[in-house]
Amino acid sequence: MTERFDTAFHPFVIPFLAGMAFVLAVCLIKAAIVVRELDKADRRKWILSLIHPNIIIKNGIDIILDCLIHVRLWKRNRLLGFMHSSIAFGWFMIILLGHLQVLIYCPERLSTFYYPIFFDYFIEGGQYTWISRMLDAFLLLVLAGISLAVIKRIWSRLFGMRRTTRPTFYNLIGLYSLWAIFPLRFLAEQCARAGDLSVAPWWAYSISLCTFMVVLPFGRYLHIPAEMLLITFRNAGLEIKKPHKGMARVQADSCPNCGVCIDACPMNADPANLKDSTVYLTRQLRRGNAERVREISDKCMLCGKCTQVCQVGVDGPKLRILARAARKYRINPDFSNAGTGGGVRAVNKVLYFSGCMTALTPRIGLSVESVLKKAGIDYEWMDRDGGLCCGRPLHTAGRLKEAAGLVRRNEELIVGSGAAVLLVSCPICYREFKERYRLPGIRIVHYTDYFCELMEKGLLNFEKSDVCYVFHDPCELGRGCGIYDTPRRLISKAASIAEAPKNREESICCGGSLGSLSLDFRRREKITQASLENLYGSKADAIVTACPLCLSTFARYSDRPVKDLAQIVDEQTKPI
């Protein structure tokens, strides 16, 4: 193996060097801006995490699994996962092996930055080594991924995607230059190995690299470096606190524009809502288009399905809530009319909080009370005759300060009751209690978990019916709080159960969500019908859910019975 030229330089390396210098400079500046936008405590927390051994290891593992192998996409669609991982992992291995090749065979050139990229032009005989054969194998892997990407542009359904994003001008330039890089590299290397030292293919290869790197910071491919930064932020325990800065900015930059969230979004039962998916929210956040950010943020139902399917984990609901919170309001409630009384006394008892929506569907509260009596539980019903809201509607509307005031007042009442357990029947309230309340010494539990515990202790005597139910996973209970199994265990004890085609994490929102500020009833009805059609696919006799909002929404449109799980448990149990 010998060098072909006395000097290890040719002008065709200049575009590559210019592109690399540009992308490194811009990305470092963008990263510095993001870090500076963090508050002082978060910035210190992040810096300390970078020297913590366990977090360093976790960062490395997560970057490999999420940025190179794309494990989440593999779980969603194997062909889609292979396409992304073959390009990302294959390119990474080409870079790694290229540097290893220089280190082994011409270590004196290791400091020449571009040498591993154009190795076959400067070195003769390099194709006969084992490392060269590995490089060829990974290049073929990348070319296979590029071929699939071209097919996906034509036939996205093959990859499990009915809809894809509309590419911007910058994204198209980045896409086509990325597609050109690897065929041009293959052509240039084959020419050099055949003894043809024509520089035309090397110029084309270098220019395509330069084009991709120049476009990268301004389009979808910014997600490549941004996602790595996001992983370190997330593993440091940082959360989104500002609507367009810091963690919010890096989440928006990390969106790969893959479009998986478009099919997942339940609002897209109406095609008019396609442009309001999270992928377009992040695009408008990057552009600084405040008007479109407001429109997209207000329409969303905050069901969380986009976050569930996102390969990066972009928190669409949180980004929208903070965008809503950035607005100024003229009315500032203080809840002074709530009084200062001690509230319900439930010392060492179960304190049942039914919530506003259960007040509108009283059969749920009565069923919960009946089951508690059958099991012999000592309880008090906190808001039997009315009470304060949990605060979640204010929180999702972006009224964070007002919601916090309501939370503090409720905390006083609940802690002052002396209760040992706070039992909640509304998953909307349950999530707010779990995430935002400080109730020392009080266990917060949803009735599905609590009833399951009573069943396991032998305090509930079930009689099984011959009705077959399909369970609708409420957004807040399932994706919001991770409760999927206990409702199904209760149903299977009381009756037979069937599953809808899309269930658990993939469950479709009922359409009645309190999260949307602007979605009208006509468009909500389409979402509800789509959710019901999914449930009808189970061929079950009746529908059961564990959310008063889902119950009231489905009951208006369903052609078969709809019940809350508390009703089923009450109907199918008798006193011990």
What is each model feature region?
Residues 213-216, 257, 264-265, 308-311:
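Conserved catalytic-core segments centered on acid/base and nucleophilic motifs
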Residues 75-82, 268, 298, 335:
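Short coil/turn segments at secondary-structure boundaries
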Residues 236-259, 277-302, 530:
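Ferredoxin-like iron-sulfur electron-transfer modules
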Residues 302-304, 308:
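EF-hand and EF-hand-like Ca2+-sensor regions
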Residues 22, 29, 42-46, 222-238, ...:
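Primarily the internal scaffold of c-type cytochrome electron-transfer domains
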Residues 180, 184-188, 192-196, 231, ...:
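Iron-sulfur cluster-binding electron-transfer modules in prokaryotic oxidoreductases
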